Design a protein with these regions (language model features):
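Outer-membrane beta-barrel proteins and related beta-barrel translocases across Gram-negative bacteria
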Residues: 1-194
C-alpha cells in the first residue's frame, strides 16, 4: 500500500530559550491531505517540546533530556490522537569526520488510534543508535538502528545519504524493516535559513 501526502505543509520553529534559563522550547505543526488505499482525508498535527542546553560530558560529548506533547487530528474519521512523550539523547564526535549517537524515546500512548497504517505508533519504547561519516564538506552518510525495548528485537535499520543544498538539506533514506517486508525509500527536502 502506497502512502500519498498531497500538498503537506510543515512548519518547525527554532529552539528558543525560556527567559535567561538553560531550558528551551520548540514546536512544529503540519497540515496536509493523506491517502493510504481507501483511507484518505485532511491530517493536522502539532507538537511542543521542552528541553535544555546540552550537558557537555566532555569536549565533543553531549547529553540532552526532553519531553513533549503531540496531537494529531484525522479528517478521515474525525479521530484525535494525543501522545505525551519523553526521552534522552547522547551524541559524540568519534573523530573529525565521524559522529555517533544513542537515544531512548518513550511515547505514552495506550493504543494507536490513527486510521493510517503507516502512521501507527508501533514502538512505544525504543532505543535508537547509529553513526555518521562526513564524505565531503556538503555530504555525509549515516546508519541508524531502531530497537524495540519491549522485546529487545531490532525493528528497522535506516541508511541515509545527506546533501547540503545551501538553502535546503536533502535526505535520501532506505529503511530496512528487518522483520517484515515494509522496506521503503524516502526522499525529503528540508528548508533552512527561512
Amino acid at each position: 500500500v502506497w502512502v500519498e501526502k498531497i500538498g503537506e505543509l510543515r512548519l518547525d520553529t527554532h529552539t528558543y530559550h525560556i527567559g535567561k534559563s538553560p531550558f528551551t522550547a520548540r514546536g512544529e505543526t503540519s497540515i496536509g491531505y493523506w491517502k493510504e488505499g481507501s483511507v484518505k482525508g485532511v491530517h493536522k498535527d502539532y507538537k511542543v517540546e521542552v528541553s535544555h542546553d546540552p550537558i557537555n560530558l566532555w569536549k565533543d560529548g553531549t547529553l540532552r533530556f526532553f519531553g513533549g506533547y503531540q496531537r494529531d487530528y484525522y479528517g478521515y474519521d474525525k479521530s484525535i490522537r494525543s501522545m505525551p512523550y519523553w526521552g534522552a539523547q547522547f551524541r559524540t564526535a568519534v573523530g573529525p569526520r565521524v559522529n555517533a549517537w544513542v537515544s531512548y524515546n518513550q511515547r505514552n500512548i495506550n493504543y494507536n488510534n490513527s486510521p493510517y497504517r503507516f502512521d501507527s505508533t508501533e514502538l512505544p519504547k525504543e532505543l535508537i543508535y547509529g553513526g555518521s561519516f562526513k564524505l565531503t564538506r556538503l555530504d555525509d552518510i549515516s546508519v541508524s538502528v531502531k530497537q524495540n525495548m519491549m522485546n529487545g528485537d531490532v525493528d528497522s535499520i535506516y541508511y541515509t545519504y545527506h546533501r547540503d543544498l545551501h538553502s535546503f538539506d536533502m535526505y535520501l533514506t532506505y529503511k530496512d524493516s528487518h522483520k517484515n517486508n515494509n522496506n521503503q525509500w524516502k526522499i525529503k527536502f528540508v528548508g533552512k535559513d527561512f
